[in-house]
């Protein structure tokens, strides 16, 4: 575990795997790199696995100003340069998938594969946008915050109470600035549905049929493009 320019990351597995490219994991909104601990444990004997906490989440320092998903894509490349990774796969979950797609579009010569988990290429519909803005504006009210957390836990984490307890504490610690700036980056993202048609590298799309956050139809449309 280490830091690069206030961005926390972990680096596990062989530095020079048997012909396999390194994989950089990018977590979703509200989450941090700990969400991939089981994947790290399973894959690290064969693959080099790098996980980073995006700006403001996990152990990365809080972003004091607004940023875009492309800024996080730039963070990925800076980390890859620091680790001397010429080519690599990016695995992104939900918002992490939004970032992975944009990193691929901006740095085509560096990204050799994508894994998109519970993600989509299109922007959110108006109802979802308004719900997110309500979350952002209401986060300073502790009662509303706690109510939002309890609603989101089964949607994002599932029914495991031990996992819920861990993330409940983490989410409750996020201040307004973290939520506001990350939410701004996610909700103001550009439309890339036409651009992704030009992605030629291998892409693995993984999506749960009962995903409540992003419907599986979004993954079907992503795969079709």
Language-model regions, residue ranges each:
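Flexible "cap/lid" loop of the alpha/beta hydrolase fold
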Residues: 98-106, 110-142
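Conserved alpha/beta-hydrolase "nucleophile elbow" surrounding the catalytic nucleophile
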Residues: 27-29, 88, 92-97, 208
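Conserved HGGG/HGGXW glycine-rich cap/lid loop of the alpha/beta-hydrolase fold
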Residues: 8-65, 79
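Short beta-strand/loop motif that positions the catalytic acidic residue
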Residues: 199, 205-207, 211
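Conserved alpha/beta-hydrolase "acid-adjacent" motif
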Residues: 212-218
């Amino acid at each position: 575990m280490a830091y690069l320019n206030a961005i926390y990351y972990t680096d596990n597995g062989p530095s020079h795997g048997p012909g396999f490219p390194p994989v950089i994991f990018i977590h979703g909104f509200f989450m941090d790199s700990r969400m991939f601990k089981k994947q790290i444990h399973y894959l690290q004997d064969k693959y080099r696995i790098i996980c980073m906490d995006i700006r403001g989440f996990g152990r990365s320092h809080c972003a004091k100003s607004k940023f875009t998903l492309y800024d996080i894509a730039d963070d990925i490349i800076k980390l890859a340069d620091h680790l001397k990774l010429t080519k690599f796969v990016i695995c992104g979950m939900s918002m992490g998938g939004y970032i992975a797609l944009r990193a691929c579009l901006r740095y085509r010569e560096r990204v050799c594969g994508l894994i998109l988990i519970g993600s989509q290429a299109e922007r959110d519909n108006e109802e979802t946008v308004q719900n997110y803005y309500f979350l952002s504006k209401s986060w300073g009210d502790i009662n509303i915050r706690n109510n939002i957390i309890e609603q989101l836990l089964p949607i994002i984490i599932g029914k495991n109470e031990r996992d819920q307890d861990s993330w409940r504490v983490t989410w409750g610690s996020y201040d307004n600035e973290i939520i506001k700036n990350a939410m701004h980056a996610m909700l103001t993202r550009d439309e890339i549905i036409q651009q992704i048609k030009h992605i030629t590298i291998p892409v693995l799309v993984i999506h749960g049929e009962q995903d409540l956050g992003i419907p599986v139809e979004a993954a079907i449309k992503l795969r079709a493009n």
